[in-house]
């Protein structure tokens, strides 16, 4: 369906691999499972590739693991088959030796942020030690020469020379481009906000929620760890919400003490772009954020204010600015679906 978006080099490189195997986190067992589900959807529906979703407790004997593109996560790859003819994209590649000791190609998937310090990551892209190649306006590639960007606890406090690669990328909405429906802008709204997401520490969230409640708007939360929703249920609840804001967590005092203000849980500081705001826009809602970094990334396509009372008031005005919402939908449709992300992985393969 979307193979026409690939260059001849990208088509040739992609065709060398017979299948895509996503490994780990069966659906609803972890919030990362929704990302895994989208890799399956993008490569199977979007590019017509044979796909399999396997995990440590589901290892069939009739799947050929040779010449495959594996996509996994460093905490879910204990029993993953490591095959010389395949390539491995690993988010949180906390044990690169697992792959490199078997002489396979390893490409780590990292958050597309300039700086992050946590139990997995320890890097700052503008410190003079990183040499990046732009894959798209939304993704970068780097040839790594050591494990220095891993947190010291993951490398035994020792920096070792290693030959692997990484891609810095965002996540995306769960709609593929052909699934966007501009009539969704007109879905009838309820006098409620259905806020679906993991509980987190946020200064702005309660202020905005209180502004809604003071104005007679019901605030309803749903925790995916306790009550997983299907993609369609999530979409419908977000579409029915009178507003669809997103609030980034700030991390805990302990996180700051251990890793500094640019710790991985402090999304307001590191500039993490969440899928929630991209989903909201793709579903026909006004994009709303409390993150200046998200504003810088999405520009005119998202509403931002540092004062939550102001953000609430402007959101209530702009929520019926249908030309603005449509323009934002078009932007996300062309830039932030898993078709875009899949193409970025393929471009990394071409490096």
Where does each model-flagged region fall?
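Short beta-strand->alpha-helix junction loop in the catalytic core
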Residues: 112-114, 137-138, 156-182, 199
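A conserved mid-protein helix/loop that constitutes part of the nucleotide-sugar donor-binding site
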Residues: 34, 200-210
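Catalytic binding pocket for nucleotide-activated donors in carbohydrate/polymer assembly enzymes
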Residues: 20-28, 33-47, 51-56, 222-351
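Conserved donor-binding/catalytic core segment of Leloir-type glycosyltransferases
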Residues: 22, 181-202
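Alpha-helical scaffolding within the catalytic cores
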Residues: 94-97, 175-180, 229-233
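Extracellular/periplasmic catalytic domains that process cell-envelope and extracellular macromolecules
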Residues: 14-15, 124-126, 186-189, 237-239, ...
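N-terminal pre-catalytic "stem/leader" segment of glycosyltransferase-like enzymes
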Residues: 1-133, 140-144, 158-160, 214-222, ...
């Amino acid at each position: 369906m979307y193979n026409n978006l690939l260059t001849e080099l990208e088509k040739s490189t992609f065709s060398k691999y017979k299948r895509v195997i996503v490994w780990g986190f069966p659906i609803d067992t972890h919030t990362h499972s929704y990302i895994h589900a989208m890799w399956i959807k993008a490569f199977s529906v979007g590019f017509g590739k044979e796909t399999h979703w396997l995990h440590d407790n589901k290892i069939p004997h009739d799947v050929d693991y040779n010449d495959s593109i594996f996509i996994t996560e460093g905490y879910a790859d204990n029993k993953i088959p490591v095959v010389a003819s395949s390539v491995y994209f690993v988010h949180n590649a906390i044990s690169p030796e697992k792959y490199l000791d078997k002489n396979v190609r390893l490409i780590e998937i990292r958050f597309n942020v300039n700086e992050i310090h946590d139990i997995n990551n320890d890097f700052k892209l503008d410190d003079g030690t990183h040499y990046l190649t732009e894959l798209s306006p939304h993704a970068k590639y780097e040839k790594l020469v050591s494990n220095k960007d891993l947190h010291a606890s993951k490398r035994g406090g020792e920096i070792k020379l290693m030959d692997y690669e990484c891609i810095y990328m965002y996540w995306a909405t769960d709609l593929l481009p052909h699934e966007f429906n501009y009539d969704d802008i007109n879905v009838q709204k309820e006098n409620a906000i259905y806020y679906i997401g993991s509980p987190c520490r946020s200064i702005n969230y309660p202020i905005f929620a209180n502004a809604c409640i003071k104005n007679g708007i019901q605030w309803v939360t749903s925790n995916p760890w306790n009550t997983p929703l299907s993609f369609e249920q999530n979409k419908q609840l977000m579409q029915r919400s009178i507003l669809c804001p997103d609030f980034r967590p700030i991390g805990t005092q302990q996180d700051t003490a251990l890793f500094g203000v640019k710790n991985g849980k402090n999304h307001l500081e590191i500039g993490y772009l969440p899928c929630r705001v991209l989903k909201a826009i793709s579903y026909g809602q006004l994009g709303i954020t409390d993150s200046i970094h998200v504003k810088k990334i999405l520009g005119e396509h998202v509403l931002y204010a540092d004062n939550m009372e102001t953000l609430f008031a402007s959101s209530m005005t702009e929520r019926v600015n249908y030309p603005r919402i449509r323009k934002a939908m078009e932007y996300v449709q062309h830039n932030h679906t898993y078709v875009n992300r899949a193409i970025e992985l393929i471009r990394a393969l071409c490096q």
